[in-house]
Swiss-Prot record:
Any one annotated GO CC term: cytosolic large ribosomal subunit
Recorded GO MF terms: rRNA binding; structural constituent of ribosome
BP GO annotations: translation
Subunit annotation: Part of the 50S ribosomal subunit.
The keyword Cell division appears for this protein: no
Pfam assignment, any one: Ribosomal_L22
CDD domains named among the record's database cross-references: Ribosomal_L22 (cd00336)
Role of this protein: This protein binds specifically to 23S rRNA; its binding is stimulated by other ribosomal proteins, e.g. L4, L17, and L20. It is important during the early stages of 50S assembly. It makes multiple contacts with different domains of the 23S rRNA in the assembled 50S subunit and ribosome. The globular domain of the protein is located near the polypeptide exit tunnel on the outside of the subunit, while an extended beta-hairpin is found that lines the wall of the exit tunnel in the center of the 70S ribosome.
Keywords: Ribonucleoprotein, Ribosomal protein, RNA-binding, rRNA-binding
Homology family: Belongs to the universal ribosomal protein uL22 family.
Keyword Lipid biosynthesis in record: no
UniProt superkingdom: Bacteria
Species annotation: Acholeplasma laidlawii (strain PG-8A)
Protein name, entry field: Large ribosomal subunit protein uL22
Amino acid sequence: MEAKAIGKTIRIAPRKVRLVVDLIRGKNVKEAQAILMFTPRGASPVIAKVLDSAIANATHNLNLNPENLFVKEVWANESITMKRMLPRAKGSGHLIRKRTSHITVVVAERE
């Protein structure tokens, strides 16, 4: 059995999120939470929140034991890109892209 949680339209670029996501893939849930707690990246608290949600889904909906859970799959996909204008010289403007992410965490019980 596996449980899934998705964080949609998170205001961090997917490239930055993937750096942290790669650290917890395949790890035990408690170990993954410890890694996220001590990783000094802006994406760490957001990923920890999605991981906690996946653990809660597993324990509440599927009655799985949280001690036996591990991070089966985790990935970050590109979401919408908000576009903003930055005024420049002579009436021109440059485009600022504010990228967002969808973060998906799948936890499963180890056999």
